[in-house]
């Protein structure tokens, strides 16, 4: 991260009340950026971190559904952002089975609204569209997916994010294609993120935290499934590098990027569970859920060599260190500690 680059930059973040969005807002605010958010109060189920980090003191958050193009464009026109990060999404696989229509509307047409607002906003020089590692056609193999592998998606969430990738690619080729004059636009695909402040349903670490704090057992599903686990600061640092490059080079830098851990940190759900519980010194709070579940990929990993070679980006914290930082944060939350102080200290250590 080029700390000096962000001083005074006008940065618009969609989904700033969510997990990554709140962290990104605090990081940018600490580095002197002028931040505005777009988030909808209709989807306010996971905005605890936004409050705990006092993001409202950093960002003027506009209550707007990203599917509302007129509202989105109005927010762009009033703020005149120079850099845009699009994180707003319906982010859960299992919820996408329950409500596929909203999932596709938010993740595809919401992305369309942001891309079109970027196209119509002369102030924007750099836009980063956040999708997911699940956008790839999953072959359930041991190799990491590369950026040029086919898009796919078995479940509605994964499919909707693959659609967002194809939509962005179309905009890159149709509208952001003048290397001397066009806005720079790229997509970024990250693995499973951990870190303090995620309180979403149906995510492993938040579910473990709730089980610990309520003294209940957690039913663990798919314990042998592997995922590319990484601390939330890792992909955010990649997003920032991409945004800086787009700002400097415009459409010449248009691309797509994977951000994930080193291969040694691609672990099973059970291994991650045991590591988190070890950080707490707790045992015997999990059982195994043997009931039939909606389809979720059993094996998933990313090839990050492109970001390593072209962006000089690499993960800074191994999984053990990342999990220790995560546990420290949740312990502080459990004990009513000074969350903002711990959060800023962790940011300062990483960045």
Predicted regions and their residues:
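NAD(P)-dependent short-chain dehydrogenase/reductase
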Residues: 139-144, 148, 156, 165-250, ...
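Conserved C-terminal active-site "lid" loop/helix of NAD(P)H-dependent oxidoreductases
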Residues: 232, 255-256, 292-314, 335
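Generic structural signal for alpha-helix termini and adjacent loop/cap motifs
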Residues: 99, 117, 121, 174, ...
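N-terminal Rossmann-like NAD(P)+-binding domain of SDR-like oxidoreductases, especially those catalyzing
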Residues: 1-190, 333, 349-351
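C-terminal "lid/loop" region of Rossmann-like NAD(P)-dependent oxidoreductases
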Residues: 254-257, 267-273, 281-299, 340-346
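Generic structural signal for small/hydrophobic residues in well-ordered secondary structure
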Residues: 6, 16-18, 84, 171, ...
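C-terminal amphipathic/interface module of NAD(P)-dependent oxidoreductases
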Residues: 4-5, 303-351
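Residues in well-ordered alpha-helical elements
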Residues: 69-70, 82, 94, 101, ...
